[in-house]
């Protein structure tokens, strides 16, 4: 495909449309891109699409947004990639700012509280479903990959029982993968197929489309992109520090979410425990139950699930009154923009600078084995997140009254029903959340919930 074959304005319209219809998490968003770009519009070959997808699966960050950035870059160079990545995120950012405001201002209204109460068990079910789905794909059979199972179990123990820092778990898993790739290479080889590639596996190696000149590795270009990326990080950070000080809420958010962006191997569910640990426990920007509400809002809006960080930023900016008590909305919206900027900036740098570099190492075990181990650790991370959500949903007042007396039975019924709908009924996430919210409203109206 020639890079100029698709009009830039036509591409912009598609990326904006994708930003509004990108429901269903990364799998759904990638499926939409595949259907529209490969099957219908034929803007990109099957081989090139799958090769781009492999790129993004190896990187930290939201793979669907990175895939959009990569394809935009492939079609229209650097500005095409930037436009695709920004338009993929912008609609969900604006929607979440609006919904976060409604949540804070009207969240205590009886019917709104009932809907939010009903959504929480569905969110817990979604995380359990993610655990089953990702665990099944990653760990395979215990006899086939016992070391991966051991890494997943150790990750769970480290996070849930020992409360070790998430970055330490990721680094330890990478080190074990590096060693395991040499000691037991068969166990640390990545799965041969991915969701979209399963039916067309030969396309992964039958890449006959010529590589555009601007995608070939060049050391001077790499240094230029890294320098621009560093400036785009350093200048806003310096401005925040000079304006409000290093210990200010906005500067702290910028630094914290920069670190979070570099640890999102395995998707949003993998980094949420780290976000919870920092945003709820360490900094107090929001409460644990509010974090669950934010995840529900993130699941019901288009765009990457990691956009839940905009909700965290909005609530933190509102609660900390970053622009004073008379400008709560403006300060909260600014915090949401700051958090989003520092969360997604690394993804643009990874694609625009590191894409050719990652492609040159594709299929080499010394590079993929640490990532395979990190993915196994992610299963343990998601298990700890699932237990955290279940504990807060099923025992909202703690266990002081005893296990049975403290149990929220209607919440348990909703959680079981939502889990069955997702796992057995194969229902979509948005439908399950909407129905759970309606059930919560009905139960609250009857006086049986909340």
What are these regions (language model features)?
Residues 1-59, 63, 70-301, 305-450:
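Multi-pass membrane proteins that catalyze or facilitate reactions on polyprenyl-/lipid-phosphate substrates
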